[in-house]
């Protein structure tokens, strides 16, 4: 689909503050919130909704209740209406000034069907969310953007952009579920938000106890990068999980299965020399790794980075089960050593991973974005908005739930060199055929 197929008209752009207004306060961010790869980044999502089948809802305007709900929920989440400031020691803090979150209302000249395959993120999606400048300081910028775009068919899209220093993906989903509750007329949140960033004050070690090779800078691939997706259905995933249980007497997650398959298929597709090593990075929610565990409602960053490594020859000659066990062990290692590994000095941290031997996985499939209901039912699809170049995203794999009209499973959204894309899909399909349940 060409970008010009979708035409969006901006109706209004305003700053929405908490209602009633709150006293100004200053809140400290945690050690993880202040990590270089977190404090200077944003993340975003599009939540796509079909028109309501209810006759009374066909002409209803979703922008009005969502805007009103935003003012109400900011009373519970004042940092999203504030601004970032840098302290004398270089850490960031949030001044809860009440300046507001950015809210945009827009109208498309098209029906929702113009977006085509909801699972296939495309350039037109960028019109559905106001893009904040990718500035590492984020001073004087809104920490939250909400854009509601209505379509002529009655469907709509809610685009959201969060500053990563204020929340992680789970925290963002928690906020959106609360926003939806307010939009539906609830007077009280089902889950009270908790700031308490002092609970995540980890020691910054003078010496690293582990070699953080996963952050070493590496050269980029110079080739056209394309974006597509691949779905692993739950029939295949469950069959593999059952096989692991029978052979090893261990449970494995859907993420571990999908990650192992992707790792092997990508390594084969890239034809990496057998003597080299390949690495995958993936985030883990560490809320339960603290002692005591972080409380329900905590919406700050609590993500640690796990790294699984293997020799190419061993990875490709071994079984899928072996790759799954390597990933499982890397998760156990991160959990055991979280407080010594999670925080390192900025000078020791380099997050440029543009190299064919290193890839990053992120799992959005269980965050609950698809369960956000503003009164029109759950989202039929959730998609990120590509605000960075495809070249910058070339080694990034995002795991999501497929759209409601697709088979249940895990959708892998990816950015790969054009010459490798076909080979990758062939390898994935071959593994699915090999491991599919015989019924």
Curated annotation (Swiss-Prot):
According to UniProt, the reaction catalysed is: taxa-4(20),11-dien-5alpha-ol + acetyl-CoA = taxa-4(20),11-dien-5alpha-yl acetate + CoA
Q: Does the keyword Acyltransferase apply?
A: yes
InterPro entries recorded for this chain? CAT-like_dom_sf, Plant_acyltransferase
To which pathway does this protein belong? Answer: Alkaloid biosynthesis; taxol biosynthesis; 10-deacetyl-2-debenzoylbaccatin III from taxa-4(20),11-dien-5alpha-ol: step 1/3
In the UniProt entry, which residues are flagged as the active site?
164, 373
Q: Name one Pfam family in it.
A: Transferase
Q: Which UniProt keywords apply?
A: Acyltransferase, Taxol biosynthesis, Transferase
Disulfide bridge positions per record: none
Q: Per its UniProt entry, which superkingdom is the organism in?
A: Eukaryota
- EC number(s) for this protein? 2.3.1.162
Which Gene Ontology MF annotations are present? taxadien-5-alpha-ol O-acetyltransferase activity
> Which GO terms of type biological process are on file?
paclitaxel biosynthetic process
List the PANTHER family.
ACYL TRANSFERASE 4
Q: Which family does it belong to?
A: Belongs to the plant acyltransferase family.
The name on file for this protein is Taxadien-5-alpha-ol O-acetyltransferase
Origin organism is: Taxus cuspidata (Japanese yew)
Q: Which gene encodes it?
A: TAT
């Amino acid at each position: 689909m060409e970008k010009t197929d979708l035409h969006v008209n901006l109706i209004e752009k305003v700053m929405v503050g908490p209602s009633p207004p709150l006293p100004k306060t200053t809140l400290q961010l945690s050690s993880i919130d202040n990590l270089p790869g977190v404090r200077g980044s944003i993340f975003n999502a599009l939540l796509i909704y079909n028109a309501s089948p209810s006759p009374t809802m066909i002409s209803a305007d979703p922008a009005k209740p969502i805007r009103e709900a935003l003012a109400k929920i900011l009373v519970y989440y004042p940092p999203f209406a504030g601004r970032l400031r840098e302290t004398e020691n270089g850490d960031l803090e949030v001044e809860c000034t009440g300046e507001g979150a950015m809210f945009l209302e827009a109208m498309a000249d098209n029906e929702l069907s113009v977006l085509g395959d909801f699972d296939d993120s495309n350039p037109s999606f960028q019109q559905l969310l106001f893009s904040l400048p990718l500035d590492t300081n984020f001073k004087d910028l809104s920490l939250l953007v909400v854009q509601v775009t209505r379509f002529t068919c009655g469907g709509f899209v809610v685009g959201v952009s969060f500053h990563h220093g204020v929340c992680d993906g789970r925290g963002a989903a928690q906020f959106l579920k609360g926003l939806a509750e307010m939009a539906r007329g609830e007077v009280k949140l089902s889950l009270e938000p908790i700031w308490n960033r002092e609970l995540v004050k980890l020691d910054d070690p003078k010496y690293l106890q582990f070699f953080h090779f996963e952050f070493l800078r590496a050269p980029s691939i110079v080739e056209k990068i394309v974006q597509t997706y691949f779905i692993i259905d739950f029939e295949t995933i469950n069959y593999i999980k059952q096989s692991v249980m029978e052979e090893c007497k261990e449970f494995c997650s859907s993420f571990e299965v999908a990650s192992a398959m992707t790792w092997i298929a990508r390594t084969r597709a890239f034809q990496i020399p057998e003597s080299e090593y390949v690495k995958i990075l993936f985030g883990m929610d560490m809320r339960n790794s603290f002692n005591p565990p972080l409380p329900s409602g905590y919406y700050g960053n609590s993500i640690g980075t796990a790294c699984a490594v293997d020799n190419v020859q061993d990875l490709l000659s071994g079984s899928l089960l072996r790759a799954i066990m390597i990933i499982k062990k890397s998760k156990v290692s991160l959990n055991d050593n979280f407080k010594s590994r999670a925080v390192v000095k900025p000078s020791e941290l380099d997050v440029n991973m543009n190299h064919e031997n290193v890839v990053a996985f992120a799992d959005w499939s269980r965050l609950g974005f698809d369960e956000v209901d503003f009164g029109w039912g759950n989202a039929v699809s959730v998609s990120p908005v590509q605000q960075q170049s495809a070249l910058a995203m070339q080694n990034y794999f995002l795991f999501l739930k497929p759209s409601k009209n697709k088979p249940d499973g895990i959708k892998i959204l990816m950015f790969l060199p054009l010459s490798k894309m076909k080979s990758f899909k062939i390898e994935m399909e071959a593994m699915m055929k090999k491991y599919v349940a015989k019924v």
